[in-house]
Amino acid sequence: MAARREPSSDDESYEVLDLTDYARRHHWWNRLFGRNSGPLTEKYSVATQIVIGGVSGWCAGFLFQKVGKLAATAVGGGFLLLQIASHGGYIQVDWKRVEKDVNNAKRKIKKEANKSAPEINTLIEESTDFVKKNIVVSGGFVGGFLLGLAS
């Protein structure tokens, strides 16, 4: 016959699970995308973060350069065509009315600029927080962006 054991104090102890600590350590994106998703500073080394930021910055700068050239060409070409049409007598420009409209637009812009929207302030604060938290990636992005513009 087997001997009956008295439960020891170790057998009766239970582990208390703190769910707030668990939620802090296991973000929602870990459940959605897996364990390897999350902020870059938690996942990758500094060198990898710089490379990721630099490559993405270079791509953005290169595209910005190409699109910027295309936009500048389109705007410049439009002004050139307007000047040719004006010189040829096809169109008449009322410069006094243009000046009046430009001055009205300046006044409206100054009024609106003095009233900064709370959405803009929130966006600026969020952007600043992101850059502070991911300073290595942000630095790599800026460097890559400048290289992309130069190439």
UniProtKB/Swiss-Prot annotation:
Motif (YXXL): 14-17
Pfam family, one: FUN14
GO terms of biological process kind: autophagy of mitochondrion; response to hypoxia
Main location: mitochondrion
Topology class, membrane: Multi-pass membrane protein
Transmembrane segments: 44-64, 71-91, 130-150
Keyword vocabulary terms for this entry: Autophagy, Membrane, Mitochondrion, Mitochondrion outer membrane, Transmembrane, Transmembrane helix
Cellular component terms (Gene Ontology): mitochondrial outer membrane
Subcellular location: Mitochondrion outer membrane
Transmembrane helix as UniProt keyword: yes
Cystines in this chain: none
Family classification: Belongs to the FUN14 family.
Function: Acts as an activator of hypoxia-induced mitophagy, an important mechanism for mitochondrial quality control.
Protein name: FUN14 domain-containing protein 1A
Gene for this chain: fundc1-a
